[in-house]
Design a protein with these regions (language model features):
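Thiamine diphosphate
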Residues: 1, 77-142, 186-198
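Conserved thiamine diphosphate
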Residues: 4-16, 20, 24-44, 58, ...
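Low-complexity, highly charged intrinsically disordered N-terminal segments
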Residues: 25-81
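Generic detector of short, locally flexible boundary/turn motifs and exposed helical patches
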Residues: 63-67, 92-95, 143-147, 170-174
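An acidic, phosphate/nucleotide-engaging active-site surface
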Residues: 69-76, 85-88, 167-176, 182
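Active-site cavity-forming subdomains of large catalytic enzyme subunits
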Residues: 118-120, 124-158, 162-166, 173-178
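Active-site regions of oxyanion-processing enzymes, predominantly non-cytosolic
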Residues: 205-207
Length: 207
C-alpha cells in the first residue's frame, strides 16, 4: 500500500500507519492464541498457529506462515468457530508489514525534522529513507541544512558558510536506531545490503 501525506507531516503519517496496522494485528494474534489454546483446535491449526507466532517478527518467513494460518482459520470458521471469523475479518493484517517512510532532505533535515526525530525516538519498527540532494530542490535550489560548507547552489552563488547538519550522528546518539549512508551510483551492492539490514532490524532505521 502507498499513502501520501502533507510534506511536513510525513514521518508522523508513516508512524500512524504503522501503529494502526500493528494494533489490528495484535488483536488478531491474541485471538489466534486463544483459539490454539482451545481443546477444540485441530492439530493442524495448532501447528500453523505455532509457526505463525514463531515467525511473527520476520517479514520474509511470516508471510507464508500467515497464508497457512488463514487456510486453517477458514476451516475452523466453516466448522462454526466464531473467533476464527473475527480473525479472518482482519486477515489482511496477519502477515508482518514492512513500513517505509520516504522523503527528501528539506523535509528530514528541516521542516519535518521534529516529526522525524519523534519517530526515531519512539523505538517503533519503521524504516526511513531520506533522498539527500543537499539543497532545497523543490523551491529551485537554495542552500539548506543538508548543504555542505562552501556548496554553491542555483540561489546560493556565494557558497554556504557553515557545515552540513549530521542527521546520521543525531540518529546514532539514541543508541538503538539502525543508521546507514548509501550512494546507489557509487556502490549498488552496499546500498542493497543496507536496505536489507534496515528491513531486518527490529526497530527504527534511517538510511
Amino acid at each position: 500500500a502507498w499513502s501520501n501525506s502533507l510534506f511536513e507531516d510525513n514521518a508522523e503519517h508513516g508512524l500512524g500507519m504503522h501503529i494502526g496496522q500493528k494494533y489490528l494485528r495484535d488483536q488478531a494474534i491474541e485471538l489466534v492464541e486463544e483459539i490454539a489454546a482451545s481443546d477444540k483446535a485441530s492439530a493442524e491449526f495448532k501447528a500453523a498457529a505455532a509457526k505463525f507466532i514463531e515467525t511473527k517478527d520476520n517479514t520474509r518467513e511470516n508471510s507464508p506462515a500467515a497464508e497457512a494460518l488463514i487456510a486453517e482459520l477458514e476451516k475452523a470458521a466453516n466448522a462454526g468457530c466464531e473467533k476464527s471469523k473475527e480473525v479472518l475479518a482482519k486477515k489482511d493484517y496477519l502477515a508482518k508489514k514492512s513500513v517505509w517512510i520516504f522523503g527528501g532532505d528539506g523535509w528530514a533535515y528541516d521542516i519535518g525534522f521534529g516529526g522525524l526525530d519523534h519517530v526515531l525516538a519512539s523505538g517503533e519498527n519503521v524504516n526511513v529513507m531520506v533522498f539527500d540532494t543537499e539543497m532545497y530542490s523543490n523551491t529551485g535550489g537554495q542552500a539548506s541544512k543538508a548543504s555542505n560548507i562552501g556548496e554553491v547552489c542555483q540561489f546560493a552563488a556565494a557558497g554556504k558558510e557553515i557545515g552540513k547538519k549530521s542527521l546520521a550522528e543525531i540518529a546514532m546518539s539514541y543508541g538503538y536506531v539502525y543508521v546507514a549512508q548509501i550512494a546507489l551510483g557509487a556502490n549498488p551492492a552496499q546500498a542493497v545490503k543496507a536496505i536489507a539490514e534496515a528491513e531486518a532490524y527490529n526497530g527504527p532505521s534511517l538510511i
